[in-house]
Curated annotation (Swiss-Prot):
UniProt lineage: Bacteria, Pseudomonadati, Pseudomonadota, Alphaproteobacteria, Rickettsiales
Catalytic activity reported: phosphoenolpyruvate + UDP-N-acetyl-alpha-D-glucosamine = UDP-N-acetyl-3-O-(1-carboxyvinyl)-alpha-D-glucosamine + phosphate
Alphabetized Pfam families for the sequence: EPSP_synthase
Binding residues annotated for phosphoenolpyruvate, in chain numbering: 23-24
The protein's enzyme class: transferase
Family recorded in the similarity comment: Belongs to the EPSP synthase family. MurA subfamily.
Record-given protein name: UDP-N-acetylglucosamine 1-carboxyvinyltransferase
Any one GO BP annotation for this protein: cell wall organization
Length: 425
């Protein structure tokens, strides 16, 4: 079991952190590489467990995947993917079941090869993330989908057919899957109520570079099927969730961090709320600087909602800051129904948190105390790290392997700015 040991040295974090390419952008783009019979080269790729799991899935289908590390620092790696010799359509259960985005391989495999078999997707246990919307949309396009225990078998005779798809609610994954499926479909596919997150737009940009015919009109995406896609070179957008997490590290410790490789426009949906609680955001050539204005952290009322609103992936980290804010804060979680698991662990540090259905009420206290904690998922682990930075004494976070699914070398980056964090297995 991986453990993180954090010692509070009462130092504000000061320094520079390089922001990686987006985890939530690179994974669907890796899946989309299946649509090309030529090589694709991806730059600004993060070195994460989920990236390597997706690489294994692609390799199991016959792809050649080459991850090239940037030896200079812990970011901006390169990934070359060649899907010219795909010879299998069955994804191994053991790997697919560990990765939520394994389901995104369904759309491109159906579109290019007419068949795919995968397991129900894994990932973080943060509540229901149903794939019903994916399945319904693909069936509307002509796919036959069977569920055999924990496996999903999808086939189509001939080509998928362009259709008008209207999602009952906004779904990033379903939007991405249908976009990829529609790339080679016969005719025009229109997606109404589509997700327009930056990561979805990055996928569309990647597909268009390869030759896809895609247009966007507000929350409508229109895809006209083409015959083939070429290879391309593409740079993954910065990870706004990683940037937001480190921004909160600066605010919580009263420090000042330069976040290199991120533009303010990339994280405006996050910094708007951070400024409300007392953050100062400054621009510089190549990134932004985050610090806390004079005084303590202010309380706030925040609700998570689809882009361009505050993202659910930042909710646990924000709660950590609210634990030591002046006054009472309320966080409403509108995306996932089981995303308050970190609250129990924050209480072990002394936090005053009450949960009622989708709302968390946090009464700020002056200080936290170190404790023995257990992580449950990726973002909750990040939240516990942030809170532990200002908890008196030592804090141990058990089951911390979740962190490496979304943050490359977080402990090294924070230590370079003054933190005292060590890792043990």
């Amino acid at each position: 079991m991986h453990k993180i040991l954090i010692r509070n040295n009462y130092k504000p974090l000061v320094g520079k952190i390089k922001i990686n390419g987006s985890k939530n952008a690179v994974l669907p783009i890796m899946a989309a590489s299946l649509l090309s019979s030529s090589s694709v080269i991806l730059h600004n790729v993060p070195d994460l467990i989920d990236v390597h799991l997706m690489s294994k899935l692609l390799e199991s289908l016959g792809a050649e995947v080459n991850f090239m590390h940037n030896k200079n620092y812990k970011a901006n790696h390169t990934l070359k993917i060649d899907c010219s010799n795909i010879n299998n359509h069955v994804m191994p259960y053991k790997t697919a079941s560990k990765l939520r985005t394994s389901f995104l391989i369904l759309g491109p495999m159906l579109s290019r090869f007419g068949k795919a078999r995968t397991a129900f997707p894994g990932g973080c246990n943060i509540g229901k993330r149903p794939v019903d919307m994916h399945i319904k949309a693909l069936e509307e396009m002509g796919a036959k989908i069977e569920i055999d225990g924990y496996n999903i078998i999808a086939t189509v005779k001939g080509k998928l057919q362009g259709k008008e798809i209207t999602f009952e609610k906004i779904s990033v994954g379903a939007t991405e899957n249908v976009i990829m499926a529609a790339t080679f479909a016969e005719g025009v596919t229109t997606i109404n109520n589509a997700a327009t997150e930056p990561e979805v737009l990055d996928l569309i940009d990647f597909l268009k570079k390869m030759g896809a015919d895609i247009e966007i009109d507000n929350t409508k995406v229109i895809i006209t099927g083409v015959e083939a896609l070429n290879g391309c070179v593409h740079k993954i957008i910065p990870d706004r969730i990683e940037a937001g997490t480190y921004a909160l590290a600066a605010i919580i410790t009263g420090g000042k961090l330069e976040l290199e490789g991120i533009n303010l426009s990339d994280i405006r949906c996050i910094t708007n709320e951070l400024e409300t609680i007392g953050a100062m955001v400054e621009l510089y050539d190549g990134g932004i600087v985050i610090s806390r204005k004079n005084g303590s952290i202010k309380s706030a009322n925040v609700a998570t909602d689809p882009y361009p609103n505050f993202p659910s992936d930042m909710q646990p980290q924000l709660m950590s800051a609210m634990c030591i804010a002046d006054g009472i804060s309320v966080i409403e979680e509108n995306i996932f129904e089981n995303r308050f698991t970190h609250a129990d662990e924050l209480r072990k540090l002394g936090a005053n948190i009450s949960i009622e259905k989708s709302k968390a009420t946090i009464s700020g206290i002056k200080s936290l105390s170190g404790a023995n904690l257990y992580a449950t998922d990726l973002r909750s682990t990040a939240a516990l790290v942030l809170a532990s930075l200002v908890a008196g004494g030592e804090t141990i976070i058990n089951n911390s392997h979740h962190l490496w699914r979304g943050y490359e070398a977080m402990h090294e980056k924070l230590n370079s700015c003054g933190a005292d964090i060590s890792i043990s297995s």
